[in-house]
UniProtKB/Swiss-Prot annotation:
Gene: pyrF
SUPFAM superfamilies reported for this sequence: Ribulose-phoshate binding barrel
Its EC number(s): 4.1.1.23
Residues forming the catalytic site: K61
Binding-site list for substrate: 10, 32, 59-68, 123, 184, 193, 213-214
The entry's keywords: Decarboxylase, Lyase, Pyrimidine biosynthesis
PROSITE patterns, per database record: OMPDECASE (PS00156)
Record keyword Lyase present: yes
Subunit structure, interactors included: Homodimer.
This protein's name: Orotidine 5'-phosphate decarboxylase
Amino acid sequence: MINPVYVAIDTTEAARAIALAERLKGQVGGFKLGLEYFTANGPAGMEAVSGLGMPLFVDLKLHDIPNTVAAAMKGVVRLGAAITTIHASGGAAMIRAAVDAANDEAAKLGIAPPAVVAVTVLTSLDQAGAEQVGFERPVLDQVKRLATLAQDSGAAGIVCSPLEVEAVRALCGPDFKLVIPGIRPAWSEAGDQKRFLTPAEARAKGADVLVIGRPITAAADPAEAAGRIKAELGL
């Protein structure tokens, strides 16, 4: 079984990110780097981590007009991303533009395109928080609506919380990639995640990729923490 765990390395320090990645290579499936890291270190910082030979999840959550997102996506492909994110709420045209740009640029470079996955509702939002930003329907209904939009528009999958995995899997079928942040082992603190499950629970419900950050990166021994999660998953 392929290790589904991608470690969220949330830092501005390239040296720390590289050191963590080198330490965790044998215990995880890949590394996720986001805006915090990218704005501090740029493409060179991303390439320093991807150069270690592990799959890279470039989590920039692109959300703009279709032409702008398409142009940005070409740059993401050049970073060697295996997975990358856009916002589903950008709409069908934006999603299609992102997917087309990823495929076109990858073909030019002779590499596999990244899986373009669409963020639905941020896992830091509970129902009250979702209502504050204008979601009039329950979070689950909003996630399902955006998942259908993303799938119909060509996205490879979505990002949603573990609590929506089962419903989205039933709605979108077995081949739609479900990338799940908000994963917290039972022995770790919840932090700022409002909608979370343990790694084993999320996998049992149909999650494909488990994004785990501080339970690993903030542990006294990150490799030991990652190995503990790996064992819990039966890997």
